[in-house]
Amino acid sequence: MLRYKAIVEYDGTNFVGWQRQQNGLSIQQLLEDKISTFTKQTVNLIAAGRTDAGVHALGQVVHFDLISPNNSKDLACINKETDNKEVSKQNNTTTTIDSLKMLPCRYNAYKLMSAVNYLLKPHRIILTSCEITTLQFHARFSAKARHYKYRIINRAVPSVIEQNRTWWIKTPLNVIDMIDASQHLIGKHDFTSFRSSACQAKSPLKTLTKIEVDTTNYPEIQIYFSAPSFLHHMVRNIVGTLVYIGLCKISPAAIKTILFAKNRAMAGPTAPSSGLYFVKVDY
């Protein structure tokens, strides 16, 4: 068995989300179908995060397994097209690239990536990297931290270029209040007030290690989030609440009351999915 790790970038606008669903085309379904087409094997993708409909990704991480060509033991394989370089096997021995030339090209990680990217056209999905990894690697459970960002366009008129990629807010936002309020959310808390009613997480306790409101490129506002894991809609619900604070509909001091209330109805609205990006995963 060979395990592959790939990084995926996608525009989530025209998809029902990451996960396979019966009511529309998902990113998982499309990727699995194209990988299977090239490899002639049934593939099951495991992702670091299951993004919702309309959410984008710059660095979604997935893994999948392929049966080895000899169907009996793991093989070392070329991860990229280079010459005269040693490649490590999963049993920590080494072999030269020359000895691997008989390996079918569909098991070569670089050629697999190139072929799948070709098959994905014209869909706005692309593999930005692909490599063979250890069987112990798991895209979801091996993750140490996940990073998201949310993009807001805060000006009088919407952006034609950034349509479906940002949240346009016409009224000027009080960014100072948004920054002040956001800092009360850093740390380990019960985030029930920012949790979707459909969330399946066993516990509402999460540790938010970073939340940063960046106005460097104003009128674009970017809000960055980092945590080992997130609740369903947690980032979008926090953004919606911060925007209400920026619009003076909620006072900055109220963020602590909202957090401790453990009541979703007290927080702001769920921000649109179009502004959310899954940036990267740390392992």
Swiss-Prot record:
Give binding positions for substrate: Y148
* Record-linked InterPro entries: PsdUridine_synth_cat_dom_sf, PsdUridine_synth_TruA, PsdUridine_synth_TruA_a/b_dom, PsdUridine_synth_TruA_C, TruA/RsuA/RluB/E/F_N
Catalysed reactions, semicolon-separated? uridine(38/39/40) in tRNA = pseudouridine(38/39/40) in tRNA
Gene Ontology MF terms in the entry: RNA binding; tRNA pseudouridine(38-40) synthase activity
Q: Name one GO biological process term.
A: tRNA pseudouridine synthesis
Which SUPFAM superfamilies does this entry report, sorted A to Z? Pseudouridine synthase
**What are the alphabetically sorted keywords of the record?**
Isomerase, tRNA processing
| EC number, UniProt record | 5.4.99.12
Q: Where is the active site?
A: D52 (nucleophile)
Q: How does it assemble?
A: Homodimer.
Record function comment: Formation of pseudouridine at positions 38, 39 and 40 in the anticodon stem and loop of transfer RNAs.
NCBIfam families from the UniProt entry: hisT_truA (TIGR00071)
State the similarity comment: Belongs to the tRNA pseudouridine synthase TruA family.
Q: What is this protein called?
A: tRNA pseudouridine synthase A
